[in-house]
Each structure stands twice: as C-alpha cells, then as structure tokens.
C-alpha cells in the first residue's frame, strides 16, 4: 500500500473507493496497485 497526495488508476481493473473519509485504489488483478490518499 503506497500513500500519495494524488491517487490515480493504474489499470482498467483499479477501483477508487472511499472508506472513513480516505480514498483508496484497490485492484484485484494487480495488488501492487493499491494506494491510499492522505
């Protein structure tokens, strides 16, 4: 999980979701694409 001030989708399988006021990128195909904002 990488933390960025600006998150973006890295492939077509990535999904941006909000949990507890934080934005996350989750990707089942490439778990290395996981990101968190803030």
UniProtKB/Swiss-Prot annotation:
GO molecular function, one term: structural constituent of ribosome
Domain of life: Bacteria
UniProt key word Transcription regulation: no
Protein name stated in the entry: Large ribosomal subunit protein bL36
Keywords of this entry: Ribonucleoprotein, Ribosomal protein
InterPro entries per UniProt: Ribosomal_bL36, Ribosomal_bL36_sp, Ribosomal_LSU_bL36
Matches recorded under HAMAP family: Ribosomal_bL36
Gene Ontology biological process terms, A to Z: translation
One Pfam family in the UniProt entry: Ribosomal_L36
Any GO CC annotation of this UniProt entry: ribonucleoprotein complex
């Amino acid at each position: 999980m990488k933390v960025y001030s600006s998150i973006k989708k890295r492939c077509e399988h990535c999904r941006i979701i909000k949990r507890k006021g934080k934005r996350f990128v989750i990707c089942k195909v490439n778990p290395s694409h996981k990101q968190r904002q803030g």
